[in-house]
């Protein structure tokens, strides 16, 4: 009875708020199906770490440090960057770069749509965040959860909780974020532009050489990005080599599912009331939304600028698919195109831009690590 009273008496309002946050994440995962693989374990973990005297996280008791399970997992999987890198292998194994390789102009949108990262980074500096904290906040605009986790774990581990929540929540609601921005920046006639798609065969040799070439180029431009881009491209090489089919399927399914579960559960170790319930958390979440909006706008505007020099016009909506939220963003563009003109089929173009965004986001993260690390 004394133990129960001690626990109840140790509750703080911040811990109660975080328990509500945890319950909210679980609700979003189950009821709305927003990134359930990550938000469900993150939400449950948040409840665990905010129980007073919880053995889930490391605690000082009578002058002795008692290590908690989630804290140990955090040190092994996040602090060492192991979990995000394993996720990159899984993501690489899932991606088919054929739509991009058959239409290389889409590379431009994969890079242009990363502008929100650097613009938001500047905004964070204006709000008084340090350079490393600003970079960690800006990388939310990568629309790539593992990249956001990797960079923030390196630069600002104390902000990992709100950055992860913002990144994955906004990725899940891309269908709500992008359409208003796209409509604001385009005319109806622009949204109805049709793009012919002539499927060009991409040889097996090209598919095998592509991940190797990207890794070499990234390594020369930004050596600090090699672990990020290298693990992503290794996963893709496993997919495309044709002799590791069982490993490819295992990476896409078992590896992705298990590591995502551990990643979400482990991130919760940073989501204690003392760390999370601060004014800076609201600022980070708000700036994350700004980053997604700026990414979308940059992609659309890049397409409009490119159209000034092309006789065969690009539908500006395709530029918005250059963010890394794959395949949600490509689906958004396809749906918007069909709403404007049911005969308009933009999916393959949007997928090309979307997978280019996967490369662009990882390279952007690598550049931040290279020049700020």
Residue positions per predicted region:
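Juxtamembrane and boundary regions of transmembrane helices in multi-pass small-molecule transporters
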Residues: 122-131, 163-191, 298-311, 356-373
